[in-house]
Each structure stands twice: as C-alpha cells, then as structure tokens.
C-alpha cells in the first residue's frame, strides 16, 4: 500500500478526486480557502493499492492557542475537516475490501502521529458514505444525527408532494405577494449576500466561527463553475439569499439567510424550493439541505425536513493518534478552566482539549 499526505499544490490531489465520486468539499480550491480562513494548513491523505483508493482532505492546525504549542520537545498539531461535509472517499474496489480500508486508516493514524498530530476529527459526507460502517469495527464512526436531501430524480409533481403542507402554503403565499426567486452571479452580489447572512447570524446569536469575512465570500465568487447564488426579492429589494455548491450531481446549501424585515413572510421557503427546481432542471440528483446545528434534532432540522422526507445518517470520525499528547493537552485545558480533568475528558466534546468551558 502506498500512502502520502498531499499539499494543496500537488497535482495528485485533483487527479485523485477525479477518479473518485466526490463533492465540492473535496476540491483543493475549497480546502485551501477554508484553510486560509482557519489559519490552518490544507492537506489531504491518499492511500492506494491497485484499484483500491482512500482519500480524505483535512486541515492541520497548531495547538498553540491552547497554551504552549509543545509537549515535551515537540510541536503539537491536530487535524479537522474543512467546513461542510468532506469525509472519506473510497473507490469501488476499496468499498469491497474491509482489509484495505482498515489498513489505510491505520496508516493515516500512524503518519499523522509522525507529523506531530495528536488527534483528528472528520465529518463524513452523508450522501457518499453509504456502507462505510460495515468496513470497520463497531463504533469506529460516531453517529451525529441526520441530514435532509431533496430527491431531484422525482418528477415535478412528486417533488412538490414531498414538501410539507405548511411549507407549500408558505411558498404559494410568497409567490402571491410578489416575491421573485432567481439565480444570480455571486460576484455581483457579494455585499448583499454578506449583509443578509450577517443579519441572520446576529439574529440567531451564532457562534463566532459562523461569521465569514468579505474575502471568504469574494473567493467563493471566483469559483463560478461550482458556486451559485440564489436571491429572493420583493419589489426589487433583497429579502433572502443563499450560496450553493454544485458538483457531481449534488447541490449543497452552504451559507444563507433572510433579511430580518422580511422574516414574517418566510421568503427562504420560496428560495429553497426554487433552487430545487433549478437544480433538477440541470440534471442533478440531490439538493442537500444539511441538518441541525451541530447535528442536533432542533428547529433548523425540522424546518429542513419540511422540504423532503429523505433523510441520511450523519456521522463523524474521531481519532486519538497520540494518547500521551492528547492527555497532556486535556489536562492543560482542565487546569486553565480550573475544573477537574474528568469534566473535560468526559464531556463528549472532541477533541476534549478544545471543549468550550
């Protein structure tokens, strides 16, 4: 088995992605953008043995924000998925070989440890990881809720029938009130989308990590082949907006929201259904709406379930690649917060040393 950790400009990265069924989150240009935003090094792991391949992108982060970035004489890192649903990719041959899949993941852990990483946290892709759990021992993945997708292979009538009655009423009401939904170039509407998104994050009191700067939106706007923008207007005034990714038959809702003054009219209902119609007309298979905040079964998930009964299990992968360093950082976190180590290590957050306390 050949294994390698790829840097962002390595031509083997796009070559590997082209050979595997993938999504926008696996492309080097997206991982690079997310790495810059998070001040982390964008990388990917590739394992190959004949036709069997395993690929996963990741961000390599220094642990300096947790205190001194060294444990002993060595600098300490950890690994996390880019924002969204990157997850493992497996070739067809790899999906038929539990032995290959397990050995590849063992080599991933070994090589990350050699690079100084003490842990890794990966978010799986709900639509691309079917059957993965059977390849590994029980408990290898951690269940993290469900996500919602609209099946765009349905005919127009069946697609509409899958929408909850209350959502149907809201969509028809928006149209009757004169709201118009259209796809627009993100490059020409960056300021508008940013304003609506920030208004939405302020309203829901989102964590700081959900706020993205202008450069982030502008960089997305420079990827028009995969990145699209939907806008709902009322008499020419922007009411709701959302950025979508399109790749390999999957359309992903990324960042969006509703302007507060239009909230009572719920124009985002119209936006999502209109995008489903647009994506279906372009021959895509799924519009993936995602799940609740942090995978929770919350109001956001219930809202999304109103557009489709189709649910996919969402899971994460948690690896401790260096037990000693992991324990040391966890102890430091507990000491800094003046709480018992057990309050950090048993709290369910991973990695424990980054738990919000």
Show which residues each predicted segment covers.
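Non-catalytic accessory segments adjacent to catalytic cores
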Residues: 99-144
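Conserved acyl-donor/pantetheine-binding loop and adjacent beta-alpha core of acyl/acetyltransferases
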Residues: 61-87
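A short, internal acetyl-CoA/4′-phosphopantetheine-binding micro-motif in the GNAT/acyltransferase core
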Residues: 86-96, 153-154, 256-265, 293
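Short, high-confidence coil segments that cap the C-terminus of an alpha-helix
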Residues: 40-42, 114-117, 284
């Amino acid at each position: 088995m050949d294994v390698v950790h790829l840097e962002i400009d390595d031509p083997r990265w796009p070559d590997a992605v082209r050979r595997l069924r993938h999504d926008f989150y696996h492309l080097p240009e997206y991982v690079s953008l997310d790495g810059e935003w998070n001040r982390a090094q964008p990388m990917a792991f590739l394992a190959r043995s004949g036709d069997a391949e395993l690929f996963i992108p990741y961000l390599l982060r220094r642990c300096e924000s947790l205190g001194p970035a060294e444990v002993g004489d060595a600098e300490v890192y950890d690994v996390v998925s880019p924002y969204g649903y990157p997850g493992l990719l497996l070739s067809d041959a790899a999906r038929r070989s539990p032995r290959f899949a397990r050995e590849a993941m063992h080599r991933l852990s070994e090589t990350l440890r050699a690079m100084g990483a003490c842990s890794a946290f990966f978010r799986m892709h709900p639509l691309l990881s079917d059957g993965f759990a059977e390849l590994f021992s029980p408990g290898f993945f951690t269940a993290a809720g469900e996500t919602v997708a609209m099946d765009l292979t349905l005919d127009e009538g069946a697609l509409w029938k899958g929408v909850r009655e209350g959502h149907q009423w809201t969509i028809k009401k928006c149209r009757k009130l004169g709201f118009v939904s259209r796809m627009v170039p993100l490059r020409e509407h960056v300021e508008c989308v940013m304003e609506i998104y920030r208004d939405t994050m302020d309203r829901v009191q989102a964590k700081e990590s959900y706020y993205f700067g202008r450069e982030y939106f502008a960089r997305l706007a420079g990827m028009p082949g995969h990145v699209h923008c939907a806008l709902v207007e009322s008499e020419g005034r922007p009411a709701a907006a959302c950025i979508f990714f399109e790749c390999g038959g999957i359309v992903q809702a990324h960042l969006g929201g509703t302007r507060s003054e239009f909230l009572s009219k719920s124009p985002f209902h119209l936006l999502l259904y209109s995008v489903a119609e647009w994506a279906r007309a372009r021959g895509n298979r799924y519009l993936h709406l995602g799940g609740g905040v942090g995978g929770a079964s919350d109001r956001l998930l219930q809202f999304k379930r109103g557009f489709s009964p189709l649910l996919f299990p969402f899971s994460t992968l948690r690896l401790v690649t260096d037990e000693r360093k992991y324990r040391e950082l966890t102890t430091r976190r507990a000491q800094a917060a003046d709480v018992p180590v057990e309050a950090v290590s048993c709290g369910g957050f991973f990695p424990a040393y980054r738990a919000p306390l």
